[in-house]
Amino acid sequence: MRLYVGVHLKITKRFFIILICFVFALCLIIQTGCNSDDSITPITIRFWHTYTGKQRDIFAMLVDTYNTTEGKSRNVFVVAEYKTQEEITNYLETAFSSQASSVEYPEITFISKESAYKANMHNLVVNAEKYLSKQELKGYFDGFMKEGQIAGTDETFVFPISKTSSVTIINDSMWRQFYVDENVKLKQWETWSGINSLAEKYYQWSNGRALIAFESVEDFIFTYSAQQLPPLVQTGNKEIRINTNKETLRGIWDFYYSGVINGYILQTDNVLESLEQGKIVAYLGEPHDMTFFPKKYINFNGENSTFLITSALYPTINDSRKVYPQKGNGVSVFNHGEEINQASYDFLHWLCSNENVIQFSVANNEISSFQPIYEKKSTEQFFKQLSVFNYKKHQILSNSLHQVTEGKTYSPTGFVEYDSFCEEITHSLIDISSKALSEVHGYEKEGFTHQQAVKMVDTEDRFKIWYENVLAIANKY
């Protein structure tokens, strides 16, 4: 009996030892598995952006969504860092100058056209065509993509997320008074010749007031050149050309210079103030929220009246070539190796094709770059709600969207000292027109009629002076 008990105890003891070893081994296996998962460091993508306000909040929400869904499954984590455009440009320009190998670049950053061109010269950025499929790229608006093709090829180094497309913003209260009396049509706003005809009639009807102002004369110059062809800045065959076609420049001159000296176009740095004071009926410029516009304006009797707003498409030369302006910096992906580059473009495509990107772009009155988004039912429903709760914003955005989807949009690609080139070209036209207008006022004080004074400065010699100035500027770059 004792022997039996002893054997039984030995077997029981051995069983417990085996059981403990088994449990311990199982724990080790589980722990090893956990450690294995934890040891996989996620790919971190730093994204330097410039978004503010509501758009910044929505962007943060989109990034969080990605990190907890698609990014998590791909083991990718996006870190959004806010910086001003000036901070980004200064950092990049300093880095380009130093050419130090120790410089750290973000994986993705908002970037100016000029900085992007320089980054590409240093082989620091990678193009979208290498990492996104043809089918994926096909969905992006052509004009948005072409602006980022800074090497004179079909390779996109500045990737678009969203952009604005300028329209014509009209003081509907003043416009209604004018068109009732003069039997003019809203459709006349859609062409340069139509606006010129409106401006001439309005000048007489209003006793010498300007019809329009430009929020950006630069946008007018480059858009008009693209409408007429050839554009002032043209890419292709691995080069960037500055075209100084005399006929194209003549068209720009005839509308702007003649418009200013005749009193049809108001030169101003503050279109909002000009609207509020009743100095203009409309301006050509970027869409804005309704909070941007005045609630009252000074009417023809010098009294405060309610400011009502309507909008029209940005003017074109004719219906056969509808080219409209676009504006807004894109992003560049800096080279950090194939895996990170691919992850960066995967995130960008996810962002642009996510249905919530519509709320993000509309927050800043922009058009999202990925066209299929606008075919989604959720987008249709969003715009229906917008038309109910903010009809005027809906109308302005609808005009912008129409320009992008039904026409073509254009903004020149960048190059070294691109910003300086644009500034010089723009101010050359503004300055010569401003000086001529001062001469007109001087002649009027001397007793000449307005028509006589205009005729004295509206000469072929003036155009030749400007044309030679443009040639000199172009030859510098």
Predicted regions and their residues:
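Conserved C-terminal helix/tail region of periplasmic/extracytoplasmic solute-binding proteins
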Residues: S398-Y477
